[in-house]
Amino acid sequence: MELYERIIPKTSSTSYISGWEALNIPDENRNTADWHPRTYLFSYDKDKAINLYNTTNVLGNSGIKKRTIDYPSKREVYIANFPRAIADLVLTMKDYQLPSLHNCCSDFLNEDETEQLYQYLRSIKDNPRVDEFLKYEFTVRYFNDKKL
């Protein structure tokens, strides 16, 4: 079977590449956070498109930027940075999928990006999934912040 590059639909600041797809596209420094581009950027279905995200109602436009990507092919798109991509996953994935993000900070992010992710998610109130993620991924900080 032939493998095809997934179609990248028209993006905007409110409909952008994020999640696993963004984690597999190199950032401005040519780094990738994840290492499964074939899974998320290619398909045996020649008409399959990349999923676009929109959580701007919760997180605004922080971490979303218009830039040129070189992979899977060169084009200008709106794309989330790695911390925002993980925050979008936490907000949009099904509860049973959340464990796939366990240890994502040490697996995917540097120290500054880890702090960005924490700040994104800490700003979200009354969301049990976000609380559960913060409890697991940022245990000490989560409980220290609860004391304040």
Report each predicted region and the residues it spans.
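Hydrophobic alpha-helical interaction segments
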Residues: 64-148
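Short gly/ser-rich loop at a beta-strand->alpha-helix junction or flexible surface loop bordering the NTP-binding
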Residues: 1-66
